[in-house]
Each structure stands twice: as structure tokens, then as C-alpha cells.
Amino acid sequence: RIERLAAQLQNQICFYGAYQKNILRAGVVLFIHRDVVHAQYSAGDNNRDDGSLDLLLDFVIKKYNPEKVFSFGTSSEEFGSRLNKGLLYWKESFRSCNDTQPFYSIETKNYYLLENRLR
């Protein structure tokens, strides 16, 4: 669960919310690393026209800039085989640039082969 992970990684995982009259309108869970802030989960309410998620992300980007790079995460689906053009367009509205990334599938029984490479 995310609560358990956040408890183990204090100051590295945090939640920001945008509220209107004490009602949560948008939220984002950030994973904070030495050089990068990564938006792991973000969501707005059903009324996307109010811009609450846009406002919230603008706030967190400005909060961590220029010390860290802000990562919106992937814009693809189905293990990178399909680009979500709407999501990419939305991210680019924040002047983000996109890049491709490889996807790998590794049997969990072979995890030990990666231990020294991921540190």
C-alpha cells in the first residue's frame, strides 16, 4: 500500500491536493529523488474544465524548480506500444518535452541478476 511505502520513505513520497471549499478537486502523489520529482499518480475530479489539476501541477512544478527536474511519467499505454496522444498533448501544455523509453520484462526469479546494476 502507498501509505506503508510513504512511511518507509518519509520525505520522498508526498501528496498534494487542490481543494475548493474543503472538497478535494485534484491530487498528485510525488516521488521525490535527489534530482527528480516524479508525478506517480495524478487525478482531477470529473469536471476537468475547472483546471484544478492544471493549477495543482503548476504549483508543484514551481515549488521544486529549478532544483529538480519534474517528470510527468509515461504517456504510453500497453507497455509502451501505444501513445496516449491526449495525455501527451496535456503534458506538452506545461512545456514538457517527451522522450521514449524502453520496456523490459524480467522473470521475477531472475531479479538477483539486476541487483548490482540498479544501485
Predicted regions and their residues:
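Conserved acetyl-CoA-binding loop-helix of GNAT-fold acetyltransferases
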Residues: R48-K62
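Alpha-helical elements of Rossmann-like donor-binding domains used by nucleotide-donor carbohydrate transfer enzymes
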Residues: R4, L55-F59, G86
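Solvent-exposed, flexible loop/coil residues
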Residues: R1, Y41, F59, F94, ...
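Active-site/acyl-donor-binding loops of N-acyltransferases
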Residues: E67-R119
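Short, contiguous acidic/charged loop-to-helix segments that flank catalytic cores in large enzymes
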Residues: A43-D50, S76-S81
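A conserved beta-strand-loop-helix scaffold within acyl/acetyltransferase catalytic domains
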Residues: R1-R48, Y64
